[in-house]
């Protein structure tokens, strides 16, 4: 009986660790989405057709429309990643809840 409880405790600890990592990744995606959105808004307010884009330690001259399209694509990728992470988060939350319930039931017996 104690072997099962130990295994469940390890499983619970692992699920909580993974859940924390998923929450951190979701927070990072939030920041990236906001950055892309704000950059896109800022670029759309510029009257010029060409803008300088950061590329590592240097800059390249690029069409504003191309840069805005790249940012829109990045936002789409971020939304897909967010969807996947939310599914994983839901799974991990369910796993944590069920493991806790099972541990409680095991301790009652």
UniProtKB/Swiss-Prot annotation:
It is found in: Cytoplasm. The modification N-acetylserine is found at residue 2. Gene3D superfamilies: 1.10.287.370. Keywords: Acetylation, Chaperone, Cytoplasm. One of its GO terms (biological process) is protein folding. GO terms for cellular component: cytoplasm; prefoldin complex. The keyword Transcription does not apply. GO terms for molecular function: protein folding chaperone; unfolded protein binding. It comes from the Eukaryota. Binds specifically to cytosolic chaperonin (c-CPN) and transfers target proteins to it. Binds to nascent polypeptide chain and promotes folding in an environment in which there are many competing pathways for nonnative proteins. Present with 721 molecules/cell in log phase SD medium. Heterohexamer of two PFD-alpha type and four PFD-beta type subunits. Belongs to the prefoldin subunit beta family. This is Prefoldin subunit 1. It comes from Saccharomyces cerevisiae (strain ATCC 204508 / S288c) (Baker's yeast).
């Amino acid at each position: 009986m104690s072997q099962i409880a130990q295994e469940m405790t390890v499983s619970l600890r692992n699920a909580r660790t993974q859940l924390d990592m998923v929450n951190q990744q979701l927070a990072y995606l939030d920041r990236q989405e906001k950055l892309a959105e704000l950059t896109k808004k800022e670029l759309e307010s510029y009257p010029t057709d060409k803008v300088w884009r950061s590329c590592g330690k240097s800059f390249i001259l690029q069409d504003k429309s191309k840069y805005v399209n790249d940012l829109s694509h990045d936002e789409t990728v971020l939304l897909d990643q967010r969807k996947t992470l939310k599914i994983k988060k839901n799974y991990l939350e369910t796993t944590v809840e069920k493991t806790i319930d099972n541990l409680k039931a095991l301790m009652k017996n």
